From Swiss-Prot:
Family label: Belongs to the SLC29A/ENT transporter (TC 2.A.57) family.
Gene: Slc29a3
Ranges spanned by the short sequence motif Dileucine internalization motif, renumbered to the chain: 31-32
Chloroplast among keywords: no
Stated name of the protein: Equilibrative nucleoside transporter 3
Main localization of the protein described in the UniProt heading: membrane
Cytoplasmic compartment residues: 1-51, 127-132, 184-199, 252-305, 362-377, 438-450
């Protein structure tokens, strides 16, 4: 994929984003009024030869979300492991039935709550622990957890399903925490790069979901044992996490990456009208240790990103409210026919694969089109308009349902169309928001701002997951 003059158009805090029409002149202004990036004397901006950095960030994006996606898409495996909790009529505590029936909601809560807490921790650690340490440590923890889950695949847990459920939730919480540290650290790193690299990382996350959904379909078709499928999931995730370690270690070897990863000036909050002091020190003279004593200024970052933050929270709130808790429980209208389409492949194909592929397409479009801009009033309007998707999904054939009995959309094509719309809108709008965030602040605050943007995202996911768990009980 060719990106002409990306170092000029997408450069750090002075990026001028591209739009296809002059009708949006207000959105074509520079994201910051004054240059805030000080190139080291004698250095010229190198080119990303063979798109090496772009490919690495794309792969790191896959590795960042692949663990969570493999956990979620292994629905048949969790149902198999928790099968003793499927019916309260079997003499089990009625609470056991909730473990299986609402497993996706519990999984989402176990994922989003620790994620939110560790984003706060990562914000405090931005200038205290090197990004190199945070990235490698988080990858190592995720790798260890997947090894544990792979071992548990062959362990008979039928006599202690509640214990296994607790272990699964704990593993999900640890995976989510380590993935949060990894994602926010790498995303913060891209804040110092041209904007196309952030787009690569974010699109890679959607590719991770697509890869896991395809793997789920292949395993369902090739294997009759859900344990074999789960083992393949977990081992694949472990291998890819190991690959991410190697790719991250390779990144600083690229001249292009070294240029943008060089130290920056100490934190000083500039306004969009301020000019940097003429005697500002060059980046090459700043000792890395000088950053260790500073905590990024939260107030100015929150003020600068308030509008984008609202969009991020609302976008991910609606997405988490629907996917996966609601959408995975929409059943085909002719489920009892015995067809593999209605019994085996419907949810993996029409929910996980379709949503993740649509999400990927939406994110990839932002490589060429960035409309509306970060200051446009249209952006929050589009984000809020997605609330219309919630009743559309609820009026499909959601099961089980005891209060809302009306099924308005009595055809399988409707949830497919709604899922495409959910994925496309989530991918396109959320990528715009996440790309814009680190570009409306000085370069030295880009990493901290990236963490704040992911905090907004996780807050939306947590609220959406919690509301989805409540909504399921009222349908």
């Amino acid at each position: 994929m060719a990106f002409a003059s990306e170092d000029i158009a997408y450069h750090s805090s002075n990026a001028v984003y591209r739009v296809p029409s002059n009708r949006h002149e207000a959105d074509q202004e520079a994201l910051l009024g004054k240059p805030l990036d000080y190139p080291a004397p004698g250095l010229q901006r190198p080119e990303d030869r063979f798109n090496g950095a772009y490919i690495i960030f794309f792969c790191l994006g896959i590795g960042g979300l692949l663990p969570w996606n493999f956990f979620v898409t292994a629905k048949e495996y969790w149902a198999f492991k928790l099968r003793n909790c499927s019916s309260p009529a079997s003499g089990k505590d009625p609470e056991d039935a909730d473990i299986l029936n609402y497993f996706e909601s519990y999984l989402a809560v176990a994922s989003t709550v620790p994620s939110l807490l560790f984003l706060v921790a990562n914000f405090l650690l931005v200038n205290r622990i090197r990004v190199h340490v945070r990235v490698l440590a988080s990858l190592s923890v995720s790798l260890a957890i997947f090894v544990v889950m792979a071992v548990l695949v062959r362990v008979d847990t039928s006599s202690w399903t509640r214990g296994f459920f607790s272990i699964a939730m704990a593993c999900m919480a640890i995976i989510s925490s380590s993935s949060t540290i990894f994602n926010s650290s790498v995303y913060g790193l891209t804040g110092s790069f041209p904007m196309r690299n952030a787009q690569a990382l974010i699109s890679g996350g959607a590719m991770g979901g697509t890869v896991s959904a395809v793997a789920s379909l292949v395993d369902l078709a090739a294997s009759s044992d859900v344990r074999d499928s789960a083992l393949a999931f977990f081992l694949t995730a472990a291998v890819f996490l190991g690959l991410c370690v190697g790719l991250y270690l390779l990144l600083p070897q690229l001249e292009y990456a070294r240029y943008y990863m060089r130290p920056v000036v100490p934190i000083h909050v500039f306004s969009s009208e301020d000019s940097p002091p003429r005697d500002a020190p060059s980046t090459s003279s700043v000792a890395p240790a000088s950053r260790a004593v500073h905590t990024p200024p939260l107030g100015p970052i929150l003020k600068k990103t308030a509008g984008l933050g609202f969009c991020a929270v609302f976008l991910y709130f609606i997405t988490a409210l629907i996917f996966p808790a609601i959408s995975t429980n929409i059943q085909p209208m002719h489920k009892g026919t015995g067809s593999p389409w209605t019994s085996k492949f419907y949810v993996p194909l029409t929910v996980f694969l379709l949503f993740n592929f649509a999400d990927l397409c939406g994110r990839q479009v932002t490589a060429w089109i960035q409309v509306p801009g970060p200051r446009s009033k249209l952006l929050p309007i589009l984000a809020v308009s997605r609330v219309c998707l919630v009743p559309l999904f609820l009026l499909c054939n959601y099961q089980p349902r005891s209060h809302l009995t009306l099924v308005l959309f009595q055809s399988d094509i409707y949830p497919i169309l709604f899922t495409c719309l959910l994925g496309l809108s989530n991918g396109y709008l959320s990528t715009l928001v996440l790309m814009y965030g680190p570009k409306i602040v000085p370069r030295e605050l880009a990493e901290a701002t990236s963490v704040v943007m992911l905090f907004y995202m996780s807050l939306g996911l947590m609220l959406g997951s919690a509301c989805a768990a409540l909504l399921e009980h009222f349908i």
